[in-house]
Regions:
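Short, charged/polar N-terminal "headpieces" of proteins
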Residues: 1-60, 129
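C-terminal charged interaction modules
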Residues: 4-6, 95-129
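Low-complexity, intrinsically disordered short peptide segments enriched in small/polar/basic residues
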Residues: 7, 34, 46, 51, ...
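Polar/charged alpha-helical tracts
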Residues: 11-22, 57-67, 83, 99-103, ...
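Amphipathic protein-protein interaction modules
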Residues: 75-103, 107
Length: 129
């Protein structure tokens, strides 16, 4: 929530740049013994649309995710919605990248992808709940 306070200081640009680089997050691993630790960044559906990272045929699915499935009038299939979610996950995964995981023969589990998506849209606090 935005607020106005007299004792508030303007955020240092270096701090913003550091935050934009993402943070290290521990995720479920491919096995229970070894967690998957990755650097994740926040993502913006509207920013991805403006940057052309979400193709036009998937805009309705992005709208549905943005507005919430119960509120949205956008007509999108489950497959289209899953594709948009995967694009957000790829955007959020800073280190290793999705390309690096694929090159290593790895694909994210549903649990990993879901947690990365939640982090990308809502931040680290949602993973702590």
């Amino acid at each position: 929530m935005a607020s106005t306070k007299k004792d508030t200081h303007i955020t240092n640009l270096a701090a913003l740049e550091k935050a934009a680089n993402g943070e290290i997050v521990t995720l479920p691993g491919w096995t229970e013994e070894q967690p998957f630790v990755a650097r994740l960044k926040r993502a913006s559906l509207t920013g991805m649309i403006r940057a052309g990272k979400i193709p036009n045929p998937l805009i309705a699915a992005a709208q549905k995710l943005y507005e919430g499935s119960g509120k949205s009038r956008a007509n999108a299939t489950f497959e289209e919605t899953a594709k948009v979610m995967r694009l957000v996950v790829e955007e959020a995964l800073a280190e290793p990248t999705m390309e690096q995981l694929k090159a290593a023969g790895l694909d994210l589990t549903e649990e990993q992808a879901d947690q990365i998506y939640l982090y990308a849209i809502k931040g680290a606090k949602v993973l702590e709940a």
